[in-house]
Amino acid sequence: MEYRTIRDILTNAEKCFGNEDAIRYKIGKNEIAAKTYTQLKEDSERITALLKKLGEPKSHIALIGATSYLWIASYFGIVDGGNVAVPLDVSLPAEELCELIDRADVTILIVDEIRKDVIEAAKEKCPKLKYILSMQKEANEGNILSLTKSMMEQTIDEDTGVEKTEITPDQLCTIMFTSGTTGKSKGVMLTHRNLVENATCLDMKLPERNVILSVLPIHHAYCLSMDILKGISLGAIICINDSLMRVAKNIKLFKPNMILMVPLMIETFAKKLEDVKDLPEKVVKEAVFGSQFHTICSGGAYLNPEYIELFERFGIQILQGYGMTECSPVISTTVAWNVKKNSVGQLLPNCEAKTVDGELWVRGSSVMQGYYKMPEETKTALKDGWLCTGDLGYVDEERFIYLTGRKKNLIITKNGENVSPEELENKLSSSRLVQEVLVREAKGVIEAEIYPDEEYAKKQGLEREEEVRVELQKLIDEYNQGAPAYKKI
């Protein structure tokens, strides 16, 4: 099946799997609820109809929330109606989220009630914002609309215009923010073609009704493209993990066949396998993952090949990939029948690569349009259609990619998050007590080496080194309080 737009993916899936489960999620501790492909399509169409009443065509609409059925339905509702989705990290401080909302020219915000602080801050700090839709509210409260109530008031028929709205493959549909080496997040502009071809151009020979447990943050391109878009294109059952603290329990509850993970999670599960390694190999796999489990897809950061061999012993294949948000995001991946040691996989069919002065450049239909309202950064990243990845590496004659290092100054944590050292250094340097600061990664954690302004310290009555150290620790503690977990020092 050839898809031109994201709408085609859901439309075809609903035709093929209408009354079959599309999304499963927990209610209460151990009860599973489900929504079918028909329900998902109808709810997304209601959201499209609602957004059409509220905004202008091609409106920029932000999504802030953990993975949920309503988040997924909202995403399809936004892009299938010709609008632009702006998925944002639910864990960011309210001030930073408001800045991104404003920079992305967002006029409608769909938000989870767990971020009430963002709702209040956005009303004051985001002048372009016209409507706020709450995912949990059951009734409208002032200018905060209930998403559920408002969408259920919409009728779906031939006159709603949902299917009539013309969208083209090269139309902008999603802006995803990623950390940059300058310290300022960049809005990666992705089209329908970018995301659709990235998700569907490679036949990984996965069965149609795979059960996938979605554990990664949904605002990440990796989760959105591979869990959601690829999963739905294959008629998969997507099960929503409600907490990283409960992944092991949710594996037993949902009984998935496969999971997308980052290396940090794989390392955690490797320890669980080691804990029961004295049992027969088949029993080990069943104890940790269940007998039905067969595949882990790894991405976001480097994975030690030893883990691939360890999991293989217990009948679990790890398919390792390489990518970046600017490439929608997958550039290369291993597949069960085509693996080369020390490679991060073979280029996707829609992608080509070359090496320029040791740096890997890629080109293809998954490469972004550019960075939103950042022409200079776009010019630096894109050279005649080639994306400069910032990674050192090469491609062999069989199109396998090998990475040898990094060119750009960016920390990639084990959970796949990109952290700009300059961003953290700028925040700490705002204190008069800090003369110089160097942020770096060491043994999997972020650390800061701070040189105090001794003259200023003395003026503040901080005579002893220990007193200065205490004040600097207070500064770091204060920063950590407002920082998402992956940016903590």
What are these regions (language model features)?
Residues 18-21, 134, 154-177, 184, ...:
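Conserved pre-ATP/AMP-binding loop-to-beta segment of ANL
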Residues 23-55, 59-68, 72-76, 93-98, ...:
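Conserved AMP-binding/adenylate-forming core of the ANL superfamily
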Residues 34-38, 173-199:
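Conserved AMP-binding A3 loop
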Residues 41-46, 169, 188-208, 215:
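Conserved structural elements of the adenylate-forming
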Residues 80-150, 444:
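Structural core segment of the AMP-binding/adenylate-forming
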Residues 196-211, 218-283:
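Conserved AMP-binding/adenylation subdomain of ANL enzymes
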Residues 257-261, 269-339, 435:
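Gly/Ser/Thr-rich phosphate-binding loop
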Residues 347, 354, 359-413, 418, ...:
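Conserved ATP-binding/catalytic segment of the ANL
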